[in-house]
Each structure stands twice: as structure tokens, then as C-alpha cells.
Amino acid sequence: SKMYGNYPNKWSNDLSNEEISRYTINALMRMRFCKEDGELEFEHKLNVDQNPKNYEAWFLHSNRLMADEKIFFGHWSSLKDINSKNIYPLDHGCVWGDRLTAYDLENHNYISQKSLEIS
């Protein structure tokens, strides 16, 4: 499908409607690392300390909008125990045998359940 692909990997006001849709899907579902200029990188899925050269995790980006807002997100199961202000990763690899995680907004803490083994 034309909806999937690695390009465009950088926003431009000159993108076609199809390219805008593809970029948006990639930014919301696949973005993990980006360059200072906003270029997205899709190959690496490891933890933030294993970032590709010249790329940073999107939530550590120096120009990140809404830095003072709490951001809860998933779809990055290799991300472990991030200690970054207002950043709350919720995907802790349940499907890979780790744990299912939620965040208690009232008490401000994570709640986790170890993945069950099904035979």
C-alpha cells in the first residue's frame, strides 16, 4: 500500500496529501529517533542509550514542543525505565514476556503485571 514506507522522513510544506498521510502515520506509530532538524529514523528500535549517530529519542529532542506537558506513550517495548521529566512510557514488552503497564494518575505511579505464560 502507498500508506506505508520510510519516505518522506522529514516534514515539508510541499508534501502531497498522500505523503502527509504517510508521514503522519510514521510519526505517530514508528517514530523513535530523530535528528535536530526533525528527520525521522525508522530502523533502530533499541533503548535511548543505543541511539543511531546524530539521532536522539524524540522525547529528548531539544526543540520538543510541550516540554512542560506530561506525555504518555507506547509502541517502544525496548524502552526501559526512562527518568525524564514528564515522559511516561507505557509499553513494557508484555507481548515479549515482560510486563503489562499502566499509570495511576491519582497516585502518580506505575502499575505493572508480569506477562502470563500461556501453554
PLM ranges: what are they?
Residues 1-119:
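Feature recognizes metal-dependent phosphohydrolase scaffolds
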